[in-house]
Each structure stands twice: as C-alpha cells, then as structure tokens.
C-alpha cells in the first residue's frame, strides 16, 4: 500500500494498493508533484528520472542515497554547527552514465550523526536554500508514515482477512483507510487535543455507552486539581 501522507494533518493524500511485484521506485510516476511542497521518501523510491521531474516542477524532495549511487563532490559548505549533529554539507553530481543523464543537475548531500543510535546518516535533496539541520529534521517526518501504518495494523482488524482474493483484500484495506479518515475528521471537527489513536480508543471503549461525542474526545478546559494541602486522617490520629 503506497501512501503519500500530508503532514499538515497526518492525512493520506494519495494511496495506491498494488501487489508485491511492483517496485517502489515506479510509484513516483503516479504522483503529480505540487510546488513548492517537500516530498520525503525512503531510498527504495529513489528514481532519478522521476526525481528530476519533481525538480523541474519546482517541488522539493529529500531521501537517502542508495548504496551503489556513484557521485563526486563539486562543492561543500561550512556554515553549520557540528553540535547539532551535522558533519557535512556537500554539493554533488552523479557520475554513472545512466544516472547523470537522468538527473543532470547538482544534488545536495547532508551528513548527520544520530546521537541516539550513534549512526552516521546521509540525506540527498534538490533544495539548497534551507539549512542542513532542517534537511535532517524534515526527513525525520518520513517516520510519520510508519505511525500511520502502525495505526492501520493495530486499530483496524486486518489480521483476519474477510477473504483471500485480491478484491477481498483491497476492500478490507479500503474500509480500514475510510475508518481512519472518519476518525481524523471527527478529531478535526471537535478540535480534540487527543491523537487519532486516542480518539479511536475512546470511541471503541465507549461504543455501548450513551455519551456525548464532544465530551468524550475533548479534554476539560479546567482539569480538576486535587488540593494537596488537605491533611488526611490516619489510623493513629487518636494516639
């Protein structure tokens, strides 16, 4: 299930359900880039012909380089703070005959040290305007798609399929997606401070109760604060 998630509301803007034979890199051909949006994607989706189409449309993309990507450094920047985790900001050009023909323009490569995992991570992008740290932080949002898939798996019962035909599986997945969108709309309409997962849980555990939906999914404006100065009686107050 290939999904383009709009980070402004964690809402799927594009979904394409395919079989496992279709390669991820072919999926970019189905997406119409919207300038000046940023598209963060896993390196499995990197296809330089499609990425150049995004570049020509004035849309920005951020991904990670594949292990076999041939390139050479043509320039480097030094206007970054290494204490933020940034250790390199380079301008590169592709060197393999096919790649440089598909993407003839320079590409930016940022090297980031993740202190949590102690790993060095490289990012590639066609944007040369934002800071190197912003490139790394934007790519972090790619993991929001994993949260979406986790929600689909945990909150909608797809473990037991209704059927094993292609049509049955597609129908089951679309029902799960529709349920997600309905809950997201409810959350937005009532301006709930709870996450989509929390809203779904509250609705599920209260399904058989007569309760106002707004009251259920909105947090009280003035939460009750217990008086910590009240002296509680003990078993030994009389002694």
Language model feature labels by segment:
Residues 1-239:
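Single, function-defining residue in the core of a domain
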């Amino acid at each position: 299930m290939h999904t383009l998630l709009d980070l402004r509301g964690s809402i799927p803007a594009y979904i394409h359900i395919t079989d496992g034979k279709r390669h991820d890199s072919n999926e970019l051909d189905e997406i119409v880039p919207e300038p000046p949006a940023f598209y963060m994607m896993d390196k499995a989706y990197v296809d330089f012909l499609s990425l150049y189409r995004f570049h020509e449309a004035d849309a920005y993309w951020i991904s990670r380089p594949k292990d076999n990507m041939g390139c050479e450094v043509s320039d480097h920047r030094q206007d970054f703070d290494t204490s933020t985790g940034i250790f390199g900001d380079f301008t590169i050009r592709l060197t393999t005959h096919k790649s440089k023909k598909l993407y003839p323009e320079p590409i930016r490569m940022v090297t980031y040290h993740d202190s949590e995992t102690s790993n060095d991570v490289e990012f590639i992008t066609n944007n040369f305007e934002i800071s190197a740290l912003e490139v790394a932080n934007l790519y972090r949002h790619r993991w929001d798609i994993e949260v979406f898939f986790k929600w689909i798996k945990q909150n909608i019962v797809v473990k037991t399929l209704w059927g094993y035909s292609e049509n049955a599986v597609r129908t089951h997945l679309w029902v799960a997606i529709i349920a997600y969108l309905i809950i997201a709309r409810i959350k937005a309409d009532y301006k709930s401070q709870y996450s989509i997962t929390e809203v779904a849980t509250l609705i599920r555990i209260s399904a058989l109760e007569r309760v106002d939906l707004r009251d259920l999914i909105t947090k009280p404006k003035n939460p009750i604060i217990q008086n910590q100065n009240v002296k509680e009686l003990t078993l030994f107050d009389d002694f």
